């Protein structure tokens, strides 16, 4: 029963954290590439379902059956993190800041664009100073596409 209480408290704390982040987060108006908000709410639903299953199974002492619930919580957290953190923001003429799922940022210049690699579930943009991973669910702005084309011509 103690495990169920701890799991419920941790689940509720994470739920409050993610909900506050999405409410405080400004709209994606300044982003040239972003993950749509519906993915956050899908992740939230999966997280809540997983937390319910996990806490219920821990409460009745079925530790083995709590594992699928905990895995659902992990997938829900990953979806919410992607929606909140993974984006590309324009900071000037042809300069962009890419933020990963975990919030790590890197600057890229459109003139440093080398090539694009299409994967089954994403795009990888190669630049002279690194690479940028863009998920297939991401919304890509026309300005970003055009600046990459212009950068490739130079």
Predicted regions and their residues:
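Conserved beta-hairpin
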Residues: 71-107
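Small-residue hotspots
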Residues: 43-54, 66-79
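Phosphoinositide-dependent membrane-docking surfaces
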Residues: 96, 105-121
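Membrane-helix interface/capping segments
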Residues: 25-28, 58, 89-96
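Generic beta-strand structural signal
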Residues: 91-93, 118, 127
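Canonical phosphoinositide-binding patch of PH/PH-like domains
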Residues: 124-149
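N-terminal membrane-targeting/pre-transmembrane regions
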Residues: 1-57
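Hydrophobic alpha-helical transmembrane segments
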Residues: 1-7, 60-73
